[in-house]
Amino acid sequence: MPANAKVTIRYGKYEACGTVEYREDRLDGLQAVLKADGHEVELKQIEDWNVVELIVNGETVYTCNITELDFGGDGKLDPLCAEALQAVQTAY
C-alpha cells in the first residue's frame, strides 16, 4: 500500500461512566500511528456499538473492539495499533 493511502476509521459508540456516546479519545493513538506512517485519516461515526473498522480502498482491512484500544497516548505501545498499521500496510 502506498504511504499516502486514505484510511477511513469507522467507529461506534461505547459506554463509559454510565453514558453511551461517540468518543474519539481511544482513537488518538491509532490516528497518530497511521499519520506518522504517512496515511490520510478520516473519521466516520457508525451506528454499531463498541466497534472500530479501518477501510482502505473500500475494503475493511481491520476490525477491533474500541474499548480494547488504549485511552489517549501516541499508540506506540498499543499492540492493537501495531496490528492495525500492519493491516493497512499490507492492504491492496
UniProtKB/Swiss-Prot annotation:
Pfam families (UniProt xref): UPF0728
InterPro entries in the record: UPF0728
Top-rank taxon: Eukaryota
Family: Belongs to the UPF0728 family.
Name of protein: UPF0728 protein
Protein's organism: Branchiostoma floridae
